[in-house]
Amino acid sequence: MRKILSTIFGLILLTAWVQAEPLSPADVKSLLARIRDMRVKSPHVQADFREEKTIRLMNKPIVSAGKVWFHPPNKFRREVRGNSPSVTVSDGQQLWIYYANFKSAEHYSLGKRSPVDAAIAAVNTALNLENVENTFQISGRKIDNGYELELLPRSPSMKRIFQRFNIRINSELLVERTEMVQPNGDRLVTTYSNQTRAPIPASTFEFTPPPGTEITTPLGR
């Protein structure tokens, strides 16, 4: 389950709060409205990413990099490059995680109120900022080149997934950096670059396992 959460949080995308100007509740509400309007006009987002995962029981963080494609509310593709390549794809109805080195894939059916559904819903709510005020306590600050938002979960179910979620947004209202802290102290920081809102082909969110792939269904369905 931790592997799935880390993969999802890696999408989906923190500077010091020094010299930042706090936003009033009205300012936060206005900013959220602007972000939603922008995503209605240009829903597609793709970017390169670098992820640094700090786990309590490990001395060094785990670093990975690759590219991500996202179409709200729940379609995404995430390709990790390097020595341990992987591909994670969701079309909103099913989720695939493919490990090229092992020629194996995990398959999850979505929409069945599983832990995976809960995790995806939590992150999508945070990143899409749809009705986010009902799920999180939100504070924000204006920085030189954009904004920073801190999201604290309200419900017990959300608190089991993460303790807090910080988002840095640039002046073009694109996510530049996210930081997620889990209840056990694990920390995931993802930075994004080369963002674009260019249209993404529907086939990007489709996945067919290569011949010979060993397929497992960890949740049994």
Language-model segments: residues:
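Extracytoplasmic segments of membrane-associated envelope/inner-membrane machinery
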Residues: Y98-A100, A105-R141, E148-E150
